[in-house]
């Protein structure tokens, strides 16, 4: 069984060491638990350790785990690709959407939120590695799109999100994070308060923190390996097999 408590302690130590190296304070970094395929019971174990921000990639998982997690105050971020036909469900269960990457999606979110008379925190997802396999707006379009999104009063732009290049060459991964930081600076200069940078995962969080990340998204290093490669879960057009993600005993081995 995965030692979630110990793994969280290890991640906190990695954050602390990275902050010391970068001349930053550990309190500047938020830890988001990437909980795709992780059972509600395992998430509750992490909650007991004081980590209460989770990120889900699939709308179905948001719904399946919602009731089981409700007794504990927490934030749920949607970090997967969002199809427009899933907007109604996502805004019902999520507190923030980190994957807003196109004008059509932003405008449809705006209309739905107007209908429900509410607002939603969002991050803009930027494809800083220019990989065709990834979602996210291209860096060249980010500032222009952000300015358009900022006119939609139901959307509160809180930050930027990216997935670093899948590479063992740290210098190439670093360039992705540096690019997102530059885009943030441009947007701040333009008066858009994008204070959060969601970048860095289990394998590259140190580099992300050195380059200014304020939120890292960690799943594997806390909950253990998943039954499918990470690339699978970033494709919202594919539905996963029934992994029974509720609080039943069969689901507990997935973390």
Predicted regions, residues:
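Short linear motifs centered on Gly/Pro in flexible linkers and helix caps
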Residues: 3, 238-240
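Divalent-metal-activated hydrolytic enzyme cores
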Residues: 214-215, 221
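Positively charged, low-complexity, intrinsically disordered RNA-binding extensions
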Residues: 204, 219
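Conserved alpha/beta-domain cores
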Residues: 1-203, 209-211, 225
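A short, polar/charged loop-to-alpha-helix boundary motif
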Residues: 223-229
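Active-site loop ensemble at the mouth of alpha/beta enzyme cores that anchors a bound cofactor
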Residues: 229-238
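Intrinsic disorder/low-structure terminal segments
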Residues: 77, 222, 246-247
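A cross-taxon signal for low-complexity, glycine/charged-rich
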Residues: 240-255
């Amino acid at each position: 069984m995965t030692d979630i408590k110990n793994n969280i302690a290890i991640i906190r130590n990695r954050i602390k060491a990275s902050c010391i190296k970068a001349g930053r304070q550990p309190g500047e970094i938020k830890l988001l638990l990437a909980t795709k395929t992780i059972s509600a019971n395992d998430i509750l174990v992490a909650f007991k350790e004081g980590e209460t921000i989770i990120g889900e990639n699939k709308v179905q998982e948001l719904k399946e785990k919602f009731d089981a997690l409700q007794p504990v105050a927490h934030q749920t971020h949607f970090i997967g690709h969002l199809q427009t036909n899933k907007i109604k469900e996502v805004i019902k269960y999520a507190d923030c959407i980190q994957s807003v990457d196109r004008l059509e999606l932003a405008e449809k979110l705006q209309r739905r939120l107007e209908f429900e008379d509410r607002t939603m925190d969002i991050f803009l997802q930027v494809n800083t590695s220019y990989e065709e396999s990834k979602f996210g707006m291209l860096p060249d379009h980010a500032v222009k799109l952000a300015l358009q999104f900022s006119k939609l009063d139901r959307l509160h732009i809180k930050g930027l999100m990216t997935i670093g290049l899948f590479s063992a060459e740290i210098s190439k991964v670093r360039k992705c994070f540096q690019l997102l930081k530059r885009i943030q600076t441009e947007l701040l200069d333009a008066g858009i308060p994008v204070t959060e940078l969601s970048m860095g995962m289990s394998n590259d969080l140190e580099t992300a923190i050195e380059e200014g990340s304020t939120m890292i998204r960690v799943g594997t290093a806390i909950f253990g390996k998943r039954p499918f490669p990470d690339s699978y879960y970033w494709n919202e057009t594919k539905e996963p097999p029934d992994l029974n993600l509720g609080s039943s005993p069969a689901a507990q081995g997935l973390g």
